């Protein structure tokens, strides 16, 4: 469980209606199976000790006595199981019958959570048998122990403070104000739901959405264990659709109509960090809850969950296309507002034939369509110099032509050579000065020509470059409005590809596809045999790794060793551990060292959950030390 990952399980035993001894054997069999997978939190269905469909047999004393005896047996038989276990049963108390979840840990019964909302509509008539536990807060004597009985219990792990668990039962989730809301506000990072939800057409997707939505709304893990085969089919069928969700993401789902166990690793540290980040999330002491301690051994959890290698890019094409369309619209609407505000009808962009300037031009073209402005008011400036290749030059020319934009070529070789002479720089020394002189010359030309034309200079730099500081200060770092500032490099490719696929123009599509096939490069060093010699990813590392690091550092707040661990799992077979660690160190070093560039960024629209604007998402001092983070990385062993 180190780094916050906790192995959880939801299982459906094969019940025999009203046969508590048979059900006890089935429940213990499921628990033992969960134990082999090292689950530390185990959840079984509602009323699983008796079966949910006992109907009026719940009024029989013999059944209730047998259920209680079975609970004691299950507790005794699981004394050696290192887990917090939830099982469901009917329980008498103070002249009423309650539908409860019993929490077990190392042979001890820790507490009883009664069902709050008792359905009595359509196929449900639970009020015939059960009372609501909404206003019940008392203790029950079990042997020589006093055990709490209430709907507001939170079970807290003594060895891992973020592992806090609350319980609700079936219908409790389906009401306007579920008990889980109060439990989450009280500090529960995981909600378990013991359910017996019958099947009917359309209910599967609704149930899934309900669990996902509640986990997102409460910023929690949600474990849903429901009844399955073995329940009476007199009038209903139960499908066993067990679900495990974390903050809006489905981690595991059982195939229906099979009694199975599902597993997942919920990251309770991330949930705690996310709640702390949200200033509107109530503090834990705002809710009236009772804390019940439990113990499990805090050990390393073997990870089976998958982490998206491209967290900024949806893996499903339909969703990805929708995302691309949305992002292009956000970028265009941001630029439209700025141009409208300053009464500007012209835009200028430095066009290199690379990905970023291509995307910026596509956004400008869409903006002009929205504003009803002529495409010739788009001024594209291409500025070849020492590193420019024929491929990128030709693509820049073709792209501007396809979009109907005006293209001007300004060869900057002579100007840069004059500048070298002015500052006494040897043009055979290809150092940072050699490169930055070109970048700043281009920016000066663009700024001045924008003034000449009365145009808005649109910046092209993307989120990944800003994170790494891969931009020349007051060179390509500067513009009048940066449309790509919150678009990571891995997403830039998909945006350009989406535009190519949907533009409906063959020539434009071919140009965009060739740009996509061109190596990423600033083209500041002379080419070799007419081909790009300076490749960005050879110098600063693969953007797919850096975008992965960026997402989990800023969006998830993960520590360096945690990012390293999940990166090794995610990119296994693509990069070895040494390579992953090498570029992770470079990422942290550059991210801290280059903050001064981000502290004075031009305006630009936020499009995703990760952004670096000093006016919005990242308030970070330019002179902060990376020592604490680098120290953690130095301790890692490859």
Map each language-model feature to its residues.
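ATP/NTP-dependent adenylation/nucleotidyl-transfer catalytic domains that generate, transfer
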Residues: 18, 23, 161-163, 219-220, ...
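Enzyme catalytic cores with a strong preference for nitrogen-chemistry domains
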Residues: 1-350, 366-375, 407
């Amino acid at each position: 469980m180190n780094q916050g990952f906790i192995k959880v399980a939801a299982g459906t035993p094969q019940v025999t209606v009203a046969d508590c001894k048979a059900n006890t054997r089935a429940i213990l069999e499921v628990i033992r199976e969960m134990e082999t997978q090292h689950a530390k939190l185990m959840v079984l269905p509602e009323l699983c000790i008796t079966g949910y469909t006992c109907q009026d047999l719940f009024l029989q004393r013999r059944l209730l006595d047998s259920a209680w005896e079975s609970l004691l047996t299950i507790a005794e038989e699981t004394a050696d199981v290192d887990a917090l276990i939830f099982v469901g049963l009917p329980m008498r108390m103070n002249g009423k019958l309650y539908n409860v979840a019993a929490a077990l840990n190392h042979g001890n019964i820790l507490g009883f959570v009664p069902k709050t909302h008792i359905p009595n509509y359509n196929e449900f008539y639970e009020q015939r048998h059960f009372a609501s536990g909404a206003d019940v807060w008392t203790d029950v004597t079990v042997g020589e122990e006093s055990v709490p009985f209430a709907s507001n219990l939170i079970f807290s792990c003594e060895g891992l403070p973020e592992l806090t668990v609350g319980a609700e039962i079936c219908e409790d989730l389906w009401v306007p104000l579920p008990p889980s809301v109060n439990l989450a506000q009280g500090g529960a990072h995981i909600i378990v739901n013991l359910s017996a939800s019958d099947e009917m057409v359309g209910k599967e997707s609704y149930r899934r959405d309900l669990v996902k939505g509640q986990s997102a709304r409460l910023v929690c893990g949600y474990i849903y264990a429901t009844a399955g085969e073995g329940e009476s089919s007199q009038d209903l069928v139960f499908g066993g659709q067990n679900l495990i969700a974390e903050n809006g993401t489905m981690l595991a789902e059982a195939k229906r109509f099979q009694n199975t166990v599902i597993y997942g690793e919920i990251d309770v540290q991330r949930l705690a960090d996310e709640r702390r980040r949200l200033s509107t999330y109530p503090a834990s002491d705002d809710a009236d809850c009772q804390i019940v301690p439990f113990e499990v051994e805090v050990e390393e959890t073997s990870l089976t969950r998958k982490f998206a290698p491209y967290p900024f890019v949806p893996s499903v094409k339909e969703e990805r296309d929708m995302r691309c369309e949305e992002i292009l619209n956000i970028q265009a609407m941001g630029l439209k507002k700025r141009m409208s505000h300053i009464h500007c009808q012209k835009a200028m962009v430095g066009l290199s034939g690379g990905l970023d300037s291509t995307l910026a031009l596509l956004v400008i073209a869409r903006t002009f369509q929205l504003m009803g402005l002529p495409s010739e008011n788009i001024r594209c400036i291409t500025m070849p110099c020492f590193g420019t290749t024929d491929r990128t030059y030709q693509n820049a020319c073709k792209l501007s032509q396809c979009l109907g934009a005006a293209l001007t070529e300004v060869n900057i070789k002579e100007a840069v050579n004059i500048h070298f002479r002015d500052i006494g720089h040897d043009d055979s020394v290809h150092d940072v000065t050699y490169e930055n002189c070109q970048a700043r010359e281009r920016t000066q030309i663009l700024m001045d020509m924008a003034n000449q034309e009365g145009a808005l200079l649109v910046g092209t730099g993307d989120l990944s470059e800003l994170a790494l500081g891969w931009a020349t200060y007051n060179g390509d770092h500067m513009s009048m409005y940066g449309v790509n500032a919150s678009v990571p490099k891995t997403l830039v490719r998909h945006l350009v590809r989406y535009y190519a696929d949907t533009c409906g123009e063959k020539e434009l599509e071919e140009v965009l596809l060739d740009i996509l096939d061109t190596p990423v490069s600033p083209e500041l060093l002379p080419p070799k045999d007419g081909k790009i010699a300076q490749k960005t990813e050879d110098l600063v590392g693969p953007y797919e790794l850096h975008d992965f690091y960026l997402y989990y550092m800023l969006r998830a707040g993960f520590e360096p060793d945690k990012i390293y661990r999940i990166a090794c799992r995610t990119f296994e077979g693509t990069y070895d551990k040494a390579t992953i660690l090498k570029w992770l160190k470079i990422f942290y070093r550059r991210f801290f060292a280059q903050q001064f560039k981000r502290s004075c960024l031009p305006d630009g629209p936020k499009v995703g959950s990760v952004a670096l604007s000093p006016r919005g998402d990242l308030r970070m001092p330019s002179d902060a030390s990376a020592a604490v983070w680098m120290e953690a990385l130095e301790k890692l062993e490859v």
